[in-house]
């Protein structure tokens, strides 16, 4: 029982690392706090589910969702945890190392810790100050630091504020 509980706690910790891809370096050293109206743990399948008014904080990171599911694969599978968050929408806020805020939202957020790959699906948006990108699907490869956006049946919309881009170059 203790071993399984420890594994789930480790999974939760790793899950928070997923949202730390953009965050302050110090955020990953901060305590992870998860508050929800309900929580369930499936020890046999190594799945922990948080539902209703889920709020996750770690340092400058703030995530709000209707539901968060963290799945840990079998020990010898060679795979790592996945995190899925669902909401209307899921929102997240964090500060970057340069002190600027990064905000995002989507109906579904999926993070594969093994691949270090983040997918925002359904009315996805990433915003930094007044610059933003909107699409049906936005993916971010953390290792390669590559972002891609797809508009689905619509087009991807990007708004860049030149003065904010110039300020970034000065820092």
Residue positions per predicted region:
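Mature-chain termini and adjacent capping regions
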Residues: 1-171
């Amino acid at each position: 029982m203790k071993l399984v509980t420890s594994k789930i706690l480790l999974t939760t910790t790793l899950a928070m690392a997923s949202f730390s891809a953009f965050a302050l370096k110090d955020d990953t050293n901060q305590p992870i706090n998860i508050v929800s109206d309900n929580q369930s743990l499936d020890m046999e399948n190594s799945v922990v589910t948080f539902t209703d008014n889920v709020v996750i904080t770690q340092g400058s990171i703030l995530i709000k969702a209707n539901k968060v599911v963290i799945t840990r694969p079998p020990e010898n599978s060679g795979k790592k945890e996945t995190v899925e968050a669902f909401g209307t929408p899921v929102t997240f806020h964090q500060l970057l190392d340069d002190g600027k805020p990064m905000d995002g939202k989507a109906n579904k957020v999926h993070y594969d810790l093994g691949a270090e790959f983040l997918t925002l699906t359904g009315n996805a948006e990433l915003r930094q100050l007044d610059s933003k990108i909107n699409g049906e699907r936005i993916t971010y490869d953390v290792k390669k630091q590559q972002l891609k956006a797809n508009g689905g049946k619509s087009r991807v919309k990007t708004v860049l504020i030149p003065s904010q881009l110039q300020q970034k170059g000065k820092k």
